[in-house]
Swiss-Prot record:
Binds 2 manganese ions per subunit. It is an enzyme of class 3 (hydrolase). It catalyses: Release of an N-terminal amino acid, Xaa-|-Yaa-, in which Xaa is preferably Leu, but may be other amino acids including Pro although not Arg or Lys, and Yaa may be Pro. Amino acid amides and methyl esters are also readily hydrolyzed, but rates on arylamides are exceedingly low; Release of an N-terminal amino acid, preferentially leucine, but not glutamic or aspartic acids. SUPFAM superfamilies: Macro domain-like, Zn-dependent exopeptidases. The active site is at K282, R356. Belongs to the peptidase M17 family. GO terms for molecular function: manganese ion binding; metalloaminopeptidase activity. It is found in: Cytoplasm. This is Probable cytosol aminopeptidase. Presumably involved in the processing and regular turnover of intracellular proteins. Catalyzes the removal of unsubstituted N-terminal amino acids from various peptides. Transmembrane segments: none annotated. It comes from Salmonella typhi. One of its GO terms (cellular component) is cytoplasm.
Amino acid sequence: MEFSVKSGSPEKQRSACIVVGVFEPRRLSPIAEQLDKISDGYISALLRRGELEGKPGQTLLLHHVPNVLSERILLIGCGKERELDERQYKQVIQKTINTLNDTGSMEAVCFLTELHVKGRNNYWKVRQAVETAKETLYSFDQLKTNKSEPRRPLRKMVFNVPTRRELTSGERAIQHGLAIAAGIKAAKDLGNMPPNICNAAYLASQARQLADSYSKNVITRVIGEQQMRELGMNAYLAVGHGSQNESLMSVIEYKGNPSEDARPIVLVGKGLTFDSGGISIKPSEGMDEMKYDMCGAAAVYGVMRMVAELKLPINVIGVLAGCENMPGGRAYRPGDVLTTMSDQTVEVLNTDAEGRLVLCDVLTYVERFEPEAVIDVATLTGACVIALGHHITGLMSNHNPLAHELIGASEQAGDRAWRLPLGDEFQEQLESNFADMANIGGRPGGAITAGCFLSRFTRKYNWAHLDIAGTAWRSGKAKGATGRPVALLSQFLLNRAGFNGEE
């Protein structure tokens, strides 16, 4: 689908469809008023007859409106004018895309960027419209034999901006929106792949393909089990012992800043391509969704794709920590004591608390890059789902400025995160009689104690942890990966690169 921006009055638009908003109760938006005036009151007359109230989600498609060059006008209900927020704006865009697709419009000029969204500028509105449009049109049908295609799919969307001065920021918004949307799609595609296809080797192949596609700035190295043993990554290796699939760690290095002094931002993604729970096996109900336990790695992959596509002037390293947690004759057991790469020892009380065992060794490994900051992304705890539900990602950090940056980026991107504490009193729950620490700390504050566990391996750099257990995928009829938190991390890196969208 092609996107562009232009600046012009609606009466001069010659298109298959013009899209404008209507507020409650039957109030035309400024552009809709212009079209009404051109058509000698044709639109307002329809509203007076009760054809459209302007409630959110309502639509009215008009054909051959008098004196209007475009074939059709799509009126979209936007609710009460002063109450239009970011979430409702995205819902309006989503409804627009679905309606245009369902009614066979192949192109449209969209004036919805004129809508007032509190605290948001035209750059934000155009970029969010692009991201939302791509999200709305997403489908995962690679493995289906019968693929459904819209009769006349929407191919071109033009966003109108108020003045020619805003064309440049509008074009940048489209560029950024397309790159972020492509990253989200890549993350969703990886997450939705079944575990018999998407194993650690598959993740590694995708990482290599990324380097091939962006060979000027991207290098990928894949570290196998033999090299992990030499490095002392015993906790990571233990998790994969029960599986016949080799554990592989894919390291994607992007260099956009040629300065020798430029330190990288490191992103670490948990990549459990299937998590049965191991010997502490999970209940069978819903176990199919444990293919989504690699969504942290999928998100990091999507972000690295975005960074490479936009050629951001920063250095970023993405680590996909791929492995599979299965029961078997070689599987690690409750009661085992593991010596991690940091030489700290861990008593395993539950083999289903495996993500932190993988991550702790990777967090030690990335010390070699002397990072400016490290952010790990993981579907880590069911406790985070209980605490924050399926709408907000959990955030923990050992560095207040980094945490504030990430919270700010989450608000900018509409991919929200909420900070949880890392108090010393929670560390006490990880005490073990037989090792330096246990891998679980009991039910109380489970998301926080998991973060506390990881914090013991991050003392040499500024670090943040994103627990996406509640936000990485949806269950039920709409089952599928969400691609979160690609948008959050993309915004964070755009801000670090100097593109904060405040034009």
